[in-house]
Amino acid sequence: MESIVKFLEKGQPYFDKVSKNIYLQAIKDGFLAAMPIILSSSVFLLISTLPGVVATVGGFTLPDWWNVDVVNFCNKVYNFTMGVVGIMVAGTTASALTGSKNRRMPAGKAINATSTMVAAMCAMLILAVTQTSAKIEGADVSVFFTDNMGTKGLLSSFVAAFATVNIYAFCIKRDITIKLPKEVPGAIAQNFRD
């Protein structure tokens, strides 16, 4: 036990440095913000696997309406939450990193968290989603593969979030924005600056 404590005390400066890294903090905060969605979708996954558990452990089967309707609904909820968790984490990580970057920005300059959140989600879609065409019922249809929008695309989510926020910070620090005439209302001009 003493050797473990000595090891931890010896590594304390390193652990402190790692814990203060704004990118790791953004990943942590991004996941924490997405956690309610992740947990609630896990509940639906548990409900959808209930018929198999009941048949195996209990020795009886649930009614057909449960096996079909309830399971299909629960799988749909799970797929549309965990299936797009990569997009959500891209946005929440970008928002968290924006907060950290804003604390380090010069006075009077700030990055709009909503803008970086939406831009990171779009960047993640560009990085992770592949578009192709397929024949469905004899017609050529444009489709895209959603495999990388979920947990498989988390690395793309982080790249999209970090790149987006850093590009925004670079532009705002150097005042690279779209400037409109003074006659344009402030709310509209601010949207172009962001």
Question: What would you call each of these model-derived segments?
Answer:
Residues 1-38, 44, 53, 59, ...:
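Signature of multi-pass transmembrane helix bundles
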